[in-house]
Amino acid sequence: MNILVTGANGQLGNEMRVLAKDSSDKYIFTDVNQLKGQETTYLDITDLDSIRAMVKEFNVNAIVNCAAWTNVDGAEDPEKYELVEKLNATAPENLAKAMKEVDGLLVHISTDYVFGAEPYNTPCKENQTGTPTGVYGLTKLQGEQRIIATGCNHVIIRTAWLYSEFGKNFCKTMMNLTATKSELKVVFDQTGTPTYALDLAMAIIVILKDFADSVISTERQRVEKSSYPKSGIYHYSNEGVCSWFDFTKMIAEYNGTTACNVQPCYSSDFPSPVKRPSYSVLDKSKIKSVFGVEVPYWTDSLKKCINNLKSI
């Protein structure tokens, strides 16, 4: 199978690169920026014609869309709205149209921010609705809706609190801060679950294999083409629940930087243009039952990531 990955130089895209090394599938990694030491093909996903040309050139069967505008507060800048909307809503629609035309699959990464800041107290299910409180959440929700409207084969995965060995993220920031500061304040009134990008990438590999086995193999047998029956919205994060404060304490423990005095504080101590979800735990029952995806506990994955970072 030929798989095109967008946003290949980000956290998830880089984890897909790691897994692709042991895959028999052909991967085409794309981004708008070049990363030193990485083979990256230029692709502007806001340009539908460019996507179509690349899909045709490489005979693409599936696209994994890891690209997005992810700066939540920065998205509130009125001068940035057009770009945010293009990246988070128009681009996913373009990718969906391209896959619709070749009966391919679009795996699209979305976010817990589509639920807004609703005061939930139980894990959010895929069919729950919310009201996004900022431009980021709103445009990500629009992206989901536009993908579905094309009628393409799609798996939309909402995730949260992503971290990895790559790029800038909360885990790496707190590893540095707990190592260099004597005291640190971290919010305790926002609850969710961290997601190790490598675990999410492994789940995506499972989904791609399922698509290849159930749809592409059917087409090769010259049976009438059928849509992918598992198309839909899914949730993925690691197992367990914690606050940002809990997350930081565990980072310090695994990093060996517990000398830093980490103190809990309220979200109001760090004013932001966008209200963060107070409870954004995602229910993962669907992705586990439909695809048989294994979901590691968040502390186990965190320890693995930090050990990898310390060995670099």
Language-model features, listed with the residues they occupy:
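Rossmann-fold cofactor-recognition segment
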Residues: 33-47
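Mid/C-terminal beta-alpha module of Rossmann-like enzyme folds, strongest
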Residues: 203, 210-271
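SDR active-site strand-loop-helix element
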Residues: 6, 30, 63-67, 106-111, ...
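NAD(P)H-binding glycine-rich loop region in Rossmannoid oxidoreductase-like domains
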Residues: 45-87
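Catalytic helix-loop patch of NAD(P)-dependent Rossmann-fold dehydrogenases
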Residues: 82-94, 114-157, 161-164
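Amphipathic terminal alpha-helices
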Residues: 298-312
